[in-house]
């Protein structure tokens, strides 16, 4: 990497741009091509593995369907076959049942049974090899050993027809024999051979003992070999990659639960790579086209950059040789065009600068001569300044003595003002306290006025209530007078009634008694009314007495209100006068404080003037020394002016090498 960077650094800008553009163009396209190829390969891999799994599952379902039907049939016959049927004189009923079953199930090669004594019945009835004993056969032994459970044998060739079959066997329910069904695997072989995974991939079925059940390239019953078989037998289902006969393959497998057979679907990895090749070829074509188009575009871009740069390099060389009349013509509107304009502006600025330098050189030469003459005049003026400073220093010392005397008098005046300010502050504080006390008294009087008003209002309300009682009492008196009149009339009526009753004789006696009772009640009512009237008269007298007292209280309350109003006004005037006095005292205190502060400022200013005067004396002495130093400096300036004049001549000679017109 370091070598590549060093090579780029040593090359021209054209090659640097070319390498940079090609890197930016090629690297992303190459990465995109690789990614597209890998993505296509992964997608094809998933599709083919999905197809393999689907085919494996279909074969598994076919096995379940075929074997499941035969298991159901075996279970049916194991219950139908009994010891009585085996011991019958003829097995015609068994043969007829088997014939019906064979006619319905075309994938059954034969169905047969044997009891424990070896009596064998089969349909179709084909000749068996000599010495054939069904009780010694594996299918019989396995069925008896599993006691009523269905057993499935590995594929084998029958002794009678040499056909590859699978036997499904089961012991009868009463244990008197075994029923067995030979199912051909021809349909399973055809279905397996029809399965295509990709173009070369295939499916197969094998037993747990690695023997072929169905395989497009191997005979049924053949034992398969290879390390990859252990991966299939170590798990119920899954997928893995393996190598067989130098070919890289990938397999998906599953296990049939009824038989324990392994069902596998294998595909060649080369097919995935071959299927993904068109994607890679297309990516390479796109890469080549992109590179060609990119080179054309890059060439135009690089030329648009390098051509103005070459013009700038040539013009820069001529300017470095002193030719400031050089200009550059770049018409592009990009950064290079701006650079060309800036370059021309720089050349113009340099020309102006050289003009200015030449003018300045002439001015410097003339100024140096004037400076030499001015230095001589300044030296003479400095001598006069030195004499004047000495005279000023003597007068300044007398002024310092006068300032110190004035400062002492100001200090004494400042002490008096300070004492006056403190006294005025004490008086002001006392006035403020008086104002606060007067204000509190005014508030108390105001509260008293409010309370007196409340009392006045209550007295007036009570007076109104008593007057109402007087009116009601008079009304009651009038009512009692009416009652007395009624009682008198009732008494008179009772007398008249008694007289009339006496006249009536015996008939009016009862009425006479009633009239007497009425008269008595009238007399009692009149007496009670008189007593009530007497009480009412006394109440009216008491009410009149209360009214007189209320009027007296009301007058006293009014007198108290007038007095409290006058007192409140007096407190207000006291408070206002006290506030006015406090304000005046505060103004006086502020004035005294201002005078005190002003005297302090004057005192400070006097001290400051004295110190400045002393400093001025010291500075005057320093100025005198500086004046002497200035005389020496003027001599150095005169020498420097001569040197500056010679340097201006040298600078004029240097600017002559530049061509500006």
Swiss-Prot record:
Keywords: Cell membrane, Chemotaxis, Membrane, Methylation, Transducer, Transmembrane, Transmembrane helix. Residues 374-610 form the Methyl-accepting transducer domain. Pfam families: dCache_1, HAMP, MCPsignal. Residues 1-16, 303-661 are cytoplasmic. The chain crosses the membrane at residues 17-37, 282-302. Residues 152-228 form the Cache domain. Residues 303-355 form the HAMP domain. Changing residue 593 to A: No CheD modification at Q-593 and Q-594 but modification possible at the unidentified second site. The modification Glutamate methyl ester (Gln) is found at residue 594. CDD domains: HAMP, MCP_signal, PDC1_HK_sensor, PDC2_MCP_like. The modification Glutamate methyl ester (Glu) is found at residues 370, 629, 636. The keyword Electron transport does not apply. Residues 38-281 are extracellular. Belongs to the methyl-accepting chemotaxis (MCP) protein family. Chemotactic-signal transducers respond to changes in the concentration of attractants and repellents in the environment, transduce a signal from the outside to the inside of the cell, and facilitate sensory adaptation through the variation of the level of methylation. All amino acids serve as attractants in B.subtilis, they appear to cause an increase in the turnover methyl groups, leading to methylation of an unidentified acceptor, while repellents have been shown to cause a decrease in methyl group turnover. The methyl groups are added by a methyltransferase and removed by a methylesterase. Interacts with FloT. This is Methyl-accepting chemotaxis protein McpA. It comes from Bacillus subtilis (strain 168).
